[in-house]
């Protein structure tokens, strides 16, 4: 389960001084479930927007850790000091997550699951997991790397 509340309890501040809680006031927003716009060099594992909660969690954790490890290696090898998802990439990923889930039981109007944030009164109701499957998710992550970490800003 996404522990959005756990991340929000830690006073992690982004480059503009906003906390994650402030950044996510309208719901969690990530690129691939791995990074948050405005929080360079901060990686999340099994975050909202990833398929982790709908798969064997260990498989997803392993893929996330491998991807992050390879990414950090790439940053070091290329003397890149910061990586951050572009806001448009986050928007596009969230749109894709919702398009893939559209019409599924997960997004049915009668669904009151934590997948939609229904477990916490007042929490924004947005769909969080990627239902496209672990294989497709891995392919997308690999394509992003092959395209030079498309959707990310790399700063030297």
Segments predicted by a language model, with ranges:
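N-terminal low-complexity, intrinsically disordered segments
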Residues: 14-21
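Alpha-helical scaffolding within the catalytic cores
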Residues: 25-31
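Short glycine/proline-enriched loop/turn "hinge" motifs that connect secondary-structure elements
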Residues: 32-38
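C-terminal, flexible cofactor-proximal segment of oxidoreductases
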Residues: 30, 43-156
């Amino acid at each position: 389960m996404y522990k959005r509340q756990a991340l929000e309890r830690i006073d992690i501040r982004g480059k503009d001084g906003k906390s994650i809680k402030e950044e996510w006031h309208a719901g969690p927003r990530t690129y691939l479930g791995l990074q948050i716009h405005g929080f360079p060099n901060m990686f999340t594992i099994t975050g909202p927007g990833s398929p982790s909660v709908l798969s064997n969690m260990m498989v997803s954790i392993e893929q996330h850790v491998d991807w992050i490890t390879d990414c950090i290696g790439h940053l070091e090898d290329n003397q890149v000091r910061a990586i951050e998802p572009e806001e448009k990439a986050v928007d596009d990923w969230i749109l894709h997550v919702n398009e893939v889930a559209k019409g599924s039981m997960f997004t049915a109007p009668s669904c009151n699951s934590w997948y939609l944030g229904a477990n916490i009164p007042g929490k924004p109701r947005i769909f969080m997991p990627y239902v496209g499957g672990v294989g497709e998710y891995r392919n997308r992550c690999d394509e992003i790397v092959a395209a030079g970490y498309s959707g990310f800003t790399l700063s030297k």
